[in-house]
């Protein structure tokens, strides 16, 4: 793929109305979109190179269970190569919980998952009230 095509793809992702980030197989963030910056308040410079579980997003589910270490949808996708979709609540840079729908997709080389992509979009708080954390 030539440089112009890569630039075009990056521009398309950055202008999309959702956030997106890419993890390698060790759950290190290797790409962080402008949509992700807008939704979370974290810049690409702040997130790229960090492990997703140390990046500050601290996802919880609708019961308040913290997902990032043992119940992470991205970790499960990297492990089993299966797509997932789940409403979760991320913590933005200002420390507020934001309801988002996450969709994870594995990145393969042959039959081996090398990482994963997460797309996320904001959900209405009226339909997804912020749970108490456990």
Language model features with spans:
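Sensory modules in modular signal-transduction proteins
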Residues: 2-28, 32-37
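Terminal output helix/cap of sensory domains in signal transduction proteins
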Residues: 5-8, 55-94
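Short, acidic, Ser/Thr-enriched surface-loop or helix-capping motifs
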Residues: 24, 33, 61, 92, ...
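Short loop/turn elements at sensory-signaling interfaces that couple input to output
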Residues: 102-116, 122-127
């Amino acid at each position: 793929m030539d440089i112009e095509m890569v630039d075009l793809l990056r521009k398309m992702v950055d202008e999309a109305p959702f956030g997106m980030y890419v993890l390698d197989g060790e759950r290190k963030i290797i790409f962080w979109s402008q949509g992700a910056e807008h939704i979370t308040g974290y810049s690409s410079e702040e997130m790229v190179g960090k492990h997703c579980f140390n990046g500050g997003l601290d996802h919880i589910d609708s019961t308040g269970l913290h997902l990032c270490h043992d119940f992470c949808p991205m970790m499960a996708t990297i492990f089993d190569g299966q797509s997932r979709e789940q409403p979760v609540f991320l913590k933005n840079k200002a420390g507020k919980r934001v309801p988002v729908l996450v969709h994870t997709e594995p990145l393969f080389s042959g039959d081996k998952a090398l990482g994963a992509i997460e797309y996320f979009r904001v959900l209405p708080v009226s339909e997804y009230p912020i749970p108490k954390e456990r």
